A protein has these predicted regions:
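Membrane-interfacial loop-to-helix junctions in multi-pass transporters
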Residues: 21-25, 62-67, 101-102, 118-125, ...
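Hydrophobic mid-bilayer segments of alpha-helices in multi-pass membrane transport proteins
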Residues: 24-36, 68-75, 109, 226
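Hydrophobic alpha-helical segments of integral membrane proteins
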Residues: 5-10, 14, 47-65, 89-96, ...
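Entry/N-cap segments of selected transmembrane alpha helices
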Residues: 86-111
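Transmembrane alpha-helical segments and their short flanking loops
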Residues: 183-314, 318-321
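Short, small-residue-biased leader/transition segments that mark boundaries at the very start
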Residues: 1-3
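Helix-loop-helix junctions within the multi-pass membrane cores of secondary transporters/permeases
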Residues: 131-213, 268, 286, 290
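Transmembrane helix-loop junctions in multi-pass membrane proteins
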Residues: 37-48, 77-91, 122, 192-196
């Protein structure tokens, strides 16, 4: 990136950056605005609440657009098949299969060793939050299970302050599956439009993805919006090419959203182990349960913690005897 490109990151006016759709200047302004809000402390609380409310409204508008997205996907797929032949469907099918294999490899080769290093039984953890994983497969939204995942991690014996800090932070910044999605789809779209990306272009695209993917919402359809914004900011891949994957985006999101949820659960448990904020007796007791159906009621969590302690004590006494 030359000096002129770096200087262009600073918008001449915030309104102009938003009006012209310059993603990187908007992102720069947003980051600086966030730092300023952090610096003023409690005085900026009303502004933070207002920005949060506006973001919820905007994402609801995106949700409305996603209701008619199948029509656009149908048109895009019809155009693709009509112009390039049925072989384009085979390419999309290969993308879906490859991506599912990639997500499975990530869980086995990355998340599993991390969980094992912190003495977390991955198969039991997957079974424990299996209902939440199935929900996000159907809804394609990690936000839909946030309350239940929060409650289940507390029921596992993780101290509430750790859950309250790590889990929301992970929802905002730890998008393992989404990063896999961005990388895979970006390379696929580049090949689909006949572009051979150089190493410098790939690294530049990766840098922009690292910036634009952070702070994203866990609502259905937000990933493809971020992808389109990233391609517009990079200028290397035509934004119109995103229409090629609209027909299979739902299948792809059914793979990467559960990876996001599982990654945040593993991260919360790992940090709890590191900080000594995990009740081991409760943790082992909950993972041994044949079924895990935890409500969001804090009193239910406290009852299950006490139950775990009382069930564990006789076992320890028997061992000592």
């Amino acid at each position: 990136m030359c000096i002129r490109d770096r200087v262009s990151l600073v918008p001449t006016s915030a309104v102009g950056a938003f009006a012209e759709g310059d993603v990187l200047p908007v992102l720069f302004f947003s980051v600086m605005f966030g730092f300023a809000l952090l610096a003023v402390g409690s005085k900026g609380r009303a502004v933070v609440d207002g920005v949060h409310a506006v973001s919820q409204v905007l994402f609801k508008m995106v949700a409305f657009a996603m209701y008619v997205a199948p029509i656009g996907a149908f048109g895009a797929m019809a155009f693709t098949v009509g112009r390039f032949g049925a072989s384009s469907l085979l390419a999309l099918g290969n993308l879906v299969v490859m991506f599912y294999v990639l997500c499975a490899l990530f869980v086995v080769a990355v998340l599993w060793p991390i969980a094992r290093a912190f003495r977390v039984d991955m198969p039991r953890l997957i079974r424990y939050i299996g209902a939440e994983l199935m929900i996000v497969v159907g809804t394609n939204s990690s936000e839909s299970v946030f309350p239940r995942l929060h409650a289940k991690l507390r029921a596992l014996g993780v101290d509430p302050p750790i859950v309250a800090l790590v889990l929301p932070t992970g929802y905002a910044f730890n998008h393992d599956g989404t990063c896999l999605y961005f990388a895979s789809v970006a390379v696929f779209l580049a090949q689909a439009v006949g572009l051979n990306l150089t190493i410098a272009q790939q690294l530049g695209l990766l840098a922009i993805l690292l910036a634009t993917s952070k702070g994203g919402a866990g609502v259905a359809g937000s990933a493809i919006v971020v992808l389109a914004s990233t391609l517009a900011a990079s200028g290397t891949i035509p934004v119109a090419s995103v229409a090629l994957i609209l027909g299979v985006h739902r299948l792809l999101s059914s793979a990467f959203v559960p990876v996001n949820v599982l990654g945040n659960a593993v991260a919360t448990l790992a940090i709890a182990r590191m900080e000594g904020a995990l009740n081991v007796a409760t943790f082992e007791h909950e993972l041994r349960r044949p079924r895990a159906d935890v409500s969001d009621d804090p009193s239910d969590i406290d009852d299950r913690r006490r139950e775990a302690v009382f069930e564990r004590r006789p076992h320890r006494d028997d061992v000592r005897a």
